[in-house]
Structures are given as structure tokens and as C-alpha cells.
């Protein structure tokens, strides 16, 4: 039987494993086991340990290597593919071109693709008199980020230090803060052209730099421009096939790209797209890694409004069943961790809510309710007793 190693055992990668199994492939997973794990054929190995991974591949002789929903997963697969020749995985150089914020911005600048203005020094940022945002060059998911509307020498230096602490390389990006609504453009490539793509509006209801709420848009006025951007990047980096997932800010007729990745987005993004459009997102993501063409996968068949909301453990514990009071019926509640006890960090996710909506206005009402609940949650967090007082 054909065998594949899925390099991510956590809940967001489950749809990928299920799609692979539908091809009759025997799927194993690798990674440090968590309470999210749902696989019996699992190797409890740190997949960032290249020596251990090489030993595993040498011993087990898998036919395919499949990245999951984390940057570290794709980075590990990229490095291993150099020696093992697994299909459709980017080289480490290509991975870094997208993963590094500074390299990605330089690439986009060379391709005449709009990205935020990058400052070469703290002094240049201060002299610009513009609002700035400071980010680790090689960390994602909203960590280590500071926004300064009126930066000073002191506040900017402090923000740079925070970003450096979250960067494995110690590098940071200081750029002009761009106002706009966050979106993702999730494009599947075949022969360096966009076969099909999805537009998703994204919100951070608790942390403005970390997405926890999103829904698929039926159309976008930026479709042609984004397609052009994606294909420019695909040709420049020789991305023949597979996913190119872009996050961008939109304001009126303007767009500004923020980052791009080739991994599958997490928090059941694949499920959101599939339930909203009928398109088998997880199957399309996995197809190139098992040498199957994306072009044979049918395009979306319909559109329905469905909101995805990620609930943290802290929210779950403080709000209880109030998390379901958003003004919408609950289509699905997908718990992430089997154990929500004291051993699970507050920042970890308790589960994913899927909330159907009748139309665009209904979507915005539900999201407003989620934002309102977030304000109530913040009050509860601020007013709750400290651990010493409990």
C-alpha cells in the first residue's frame, strides 16, 4: 500500500489526512503528541529535529511527505525534500523567500506588487512622521507585534526589542502601518496560473494581529489584481502548482499584501471553505504532494455565508455557554483539546465555532456580537481575581 507521512498531528490537519485516505493511502503522522491528536499510526518525534526525521524516513520508506498547517511543518518538509525528492515541495530558499517578511517585501517590490513601506532604520521611521508597525521578521500568528501611531525614540526602541525577542534570527521589520480590512486570498496554482481562488474576510476580535473570526466572500472587486499578484509571485519563484495563500489589507480600491505562505492555513480554514463553497480544499491542498493535478479538481459549486470563530480556552472558561450567544444558530462546535484542565495554557484554543448566516448583513451582525462579547470578556479578564486571591 502507498504510504504518506503527514507532518502535523494536530486538529487542523485532520481534513488533509482524511482526503489522503480517500485515495487509498495509508497515512501516518509525526509530531509531539498533543491532546488534539486523532491518529493511531503516529510517530512521537519533534518534526523540527532533522536528524530524527531523516532516520524515520530512512526506516519507514514513505512514498509521500505532506506538510500540515504550521510553518515549521512546511520548513521541515522543504529541507527533507532536498535529499528525498518528494514531489511539489518548495526548496528551503523558496520557503525563506516567503517566510521572511523582509525578503517577501523585497520580492514584491521587485515585482511591482503593493506592500507596506519598509523603513531601513529606526531613525528613518521616526523621521517619516507616519504610524508604524514593528514585527519579528520570522515569526507569525500575530506574536511580537507592536503598533505605534505616534512613535518616539523610546517607544520604538522598546517595540524593536519585543520583536527581536520573538525572532529566531533577531531580525525585525519596521514598516508604515496600513489601515484596511484584512483578507486572505487562497489560490490554488496549476502550471504557475491560478486554477481557482477564495476570498476570505478576517477579523481579530480579541487580538487585532491574530485572526479568530472569518467568512468566505462570494466575490471580490480585487479578483483580477490579486490573481495577477499571485501569478507574478508564482512565476518569480517557479511555483508550478499547489496552494499560495496570501493575506492582504483592502481599503476602497487599494490592496496591500502583508504575507504569503504555501502551507495550509490552520483553525479549520479548509473546513470553512469546503462548507461555504463545496470545494474540497483539503484534497486540493494535498493533491500536488501525491503527484495529482489540481486542475482535475472541480471549481466551487455554490456559496453560502458561514462564519468561523476560534474560541480560546480562556474565553471558554470565563464565558461558559455564553460563547454560543452570538445571535446565530450553531452549525458546528469542533472542540480542539480533549482536556481543558489546568494544564492547558489560557492562550490555547478550546474549539472552533461555525455559525451560518442568511446574508452579508446577518454576517456583520454576528461579527458585531462577537466583538461585543470580546469586550465583555476583556472586562471579565480585567476584573477576575489573581491566582493568589483564588
Specify the residue positions occupied by each region the protein language model found.
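ATP-dependent carboxylate/phosphate-activation module, predominantly the ATP-grasp catalytic core
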Residues: 176-239, 243, 250, 261-289
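A conserved helix-loop-beta module that forms one wall/lid of the active-site cleft
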Residues: 82-151
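Short, hydrophobic beta-strand segments that form beta-sheet elements in well-ordered domains
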Residues: 4-7, 26-32, 118-120, 132-133, ...
Amino acid at each position: 500500500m502507498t504510504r504518506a507521512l503527514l507532518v502535523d498531528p494536530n486538529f487542523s490537519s485532520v481534513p488533509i489526512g482524511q482526503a489522503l485516505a480517500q485515495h487509498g493511502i495509508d497515512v501516518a503522522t509525526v509530531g509531539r503528541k498533543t491532546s488534539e491528536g486523532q491518529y493511531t499510526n503516529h510517530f512521537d518525534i519533534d518534526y523540527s529535529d532533522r536528524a530524527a526525521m531523516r532516520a524515520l524516513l530512512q526506516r519507514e520508506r514513505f512514498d509521500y511527505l505532506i506538510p500540515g498547517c504550521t510553518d515549521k511543518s512546511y520548513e521541515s518538509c522543504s529541507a527533507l525534500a532536498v535529499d528525498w525528492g518528494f514531489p511539489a515541495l518548495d526548496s528551503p530558499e523558496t520557503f525563506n523567500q516567503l517566510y521572511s517578511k523582509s525578503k517577501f517585501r523585497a520580492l514584491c517590490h521587485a515585482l511591482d506588487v503593493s506592500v507596506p513601506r519598509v523603513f531601513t532604520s529606526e531613525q528613518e521611521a521616526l523621521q517619516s512622521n507616519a504610524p508604524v508597525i514593528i514585527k519579528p521578521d520570522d515569526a507569525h500568528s500575530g506574536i511580537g507585534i507592536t503598533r505605534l501611531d505616534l512613535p518616539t525614540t523610546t517607544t520604538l526602541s522598546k517595540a524593536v526589542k519585543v520583536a527581536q525577542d520573538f525572532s529566531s534570527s533577531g531580525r525585525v521589520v519596521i514598516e508604515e502601518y496600513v489601515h484596511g480590512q484584512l483578507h486572505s486570498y487562497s489560490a490554488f496554482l496549476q502550471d504557475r496560473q491560478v486554477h481557482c481562488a477564495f476570498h476570505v474576510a478576517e477579523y481579530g476580535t480579541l487580538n487585532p494581529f491574530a485572526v479568530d473570526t472569518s467568512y468566505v466572500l462570494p466575490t471580490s472587486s480585487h479578483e483580477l489584481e490579486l490573481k495577477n499578484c499571485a501569478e507574478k509571485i508564482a512565476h518569480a519563484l517557479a511555483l508550478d502548482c499547489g496552494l499560495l495563500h496570501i493575506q492582504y489589507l483592502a481599503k476602497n480600491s487599494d490592496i496591500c499584501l502583508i504575507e504569503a505562505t504555501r502551507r495550509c492555513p490552520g483553525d479549520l480554514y479548509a473546513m470553512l471553505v469546503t462548507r461555504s463553497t463545496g470545494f474540497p480544499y483539503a484534497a486540493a491542498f494535498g493533491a500536488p504532494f501525491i503527484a495529482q493535478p489540481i486542475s482535475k479538481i472541480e471549481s466551487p459549486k455554490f456559496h453560502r455565508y458561514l462564519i468561523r470563530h476560534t474560541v480560546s480556552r480562556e474565553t471558554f472558561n470565563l464565558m461558559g455557554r455564553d460563547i454560543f450567544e452570538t445571535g446565530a444558530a450553531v452549525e458546528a462546535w469542533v472542540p480542539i483539546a480533549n482536556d481543558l484542565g489546568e494544564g492547558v495554557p489560557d492562550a490555547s484554543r478550546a474549539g472552533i465555532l461555525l455559525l451560518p448566516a442568511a446574508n452579508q448583513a446577518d454576517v456583520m451582525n454576528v461579527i458585531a456580537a462577537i466583538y461585543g462579547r470580546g469586550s465583555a470578556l476583556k472586562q471579565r479578564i480585567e476584573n477576575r481575581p489573581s491566582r493568589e486571591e483564588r
